[in-house]
Amino acid sequence: MRREELRLGLVAYPGLGGSGTVAAELADRLARMGHRVYLFATSRPFRLPEASPAVHVPVDLPYYPVFPGPLYTLSLAGTLEREAKRLGLDLVHTHYAVPHAAAAYLAFGEGLPLVHTLHGTDVSVVGMDPAFHGPTRRALEAARAVTAVSRALAQEAKRAFGVEAVVVPNAVDPERFRPRPERKRLYAEEGEWLLVHASNFRPIKRVPDIVRAFAKIRKRLPARLLLLGTGPEEEEARRVAAELGVAPWVT
């Protein structure tokens, strides 16, 4: 029996962070299953394949001198409200609650089913900031469903916002992500261990500390460190690698 086709709107950050990666992969897979999927982001998410049937809907960041900066939350809310009507969306699913949950609630109130997925620092760090906590809590309380990527995060969301989150762990596609010796040889010599870190290099990711840990590993066995991503801690990580004498083995 053919499943019902849904018109789904997903909201995400487009960069290298985990929440954007999960959202882009989910959008692509849902679209390939036959649903009409629209991914809202300020630019095309880097993990959304060029050939994906999911459609990127750009969110503009208009700037007016009267404001201190671009009003992302309002722009996203306006884009969601306008495009949901035009596209006939059945549901909107946001990834990373701040400010996506509040923007979706501002756009629809309780007039359209909203699902919010919590990814980590949107609860533990950013979401606890007094500037964001109240609006985020109200948006989560009004949602049709809230999910979290781990039991620990669901428990933290309960303490922080008083919401019950369903645990839906991030998935791994074993057909795509499996040991490939020929790929490892692109980065490491025969007999070397290859360590990989992937993130958006924000301070909470502690990338310089990863380099420090790697320097200790290098003293005990041959290894290389592959850092995938970019962000504010990139230069500091490079500096630490040079200071500890492991820069030739850090890429």
Q: What residues fall within each predicted segment?
A:
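Conserved donor-binding/catalytic core segment of Leloir-type glycosyltransferases
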Residues: 11, 147, 188-214, 226
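An aromatic- and histidine-rich active-site surface loop
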Residues: 73, 91-111, 118
